[in-house]
């Protein structure tokens, strides 16, 4: 069972101008004391076509965390507009909140984000080059997509050091019929849990 349960994420300052910081009020509960930090990240998906446009807007370490209920406001600057493809500036994209423990992601919360011009004239005749000062960001706060992953909460430093010192041959664990591809790192086994907070 997961030792951390995310109880609520409130989207603050929404809708807002595109250049405003993202703000999320995160409430979570620890079932027992966690001796190491939780790492929270806010990731802006710049393009659905490629992960190369994803931007980690901020990362924060919280911990060690005592058992009980906790709340904090996680704020991150708006994405770097120079890294967003012009064709993806206006329209729907995604912002992700992730949390890891000992380097293992155990929850991913995704929100759809609609970036649009507030001026009706700009909506009808958008400029060729996006004008980010005129864009409004609206996060669909009512319908987050939540994915949970099983992780090893009990990993000890000795076990982690041992695993770092092993140099396995590439694909040594794969049957001949398996081709390497994109998959979660070992130890992150999705429990096929997608639901709303």
Curated annotation (Swiss-Prot):
GO terms for biological process: DNA replication-dependent chromatin assembly. Interacts with histone H3 and histone H4. Keywords: Chaperone, Chromatin regulator, Nucleus, Transcription, Transcription regulation. Histone chaperone that facilitates histone deposition and histone exchange and removal during nucleosome assembly and disassembly. Pfam families: ASF1_hist_chap. Belongs to the ASF1 family. GO terms for molecular function: histone binding. Gene3D superfamilies: Histone chaperone ASF1-like (2.60.40.1490). GO terms for cellular component: chromatin; nucleus. It is found in: Nucleus. This is Histone chaperone asf1b-B. The keyword ATP-binding does not apply. It comes from the Eukaryota. InterPro entries: ASF1-like, ASF1-like_sf.
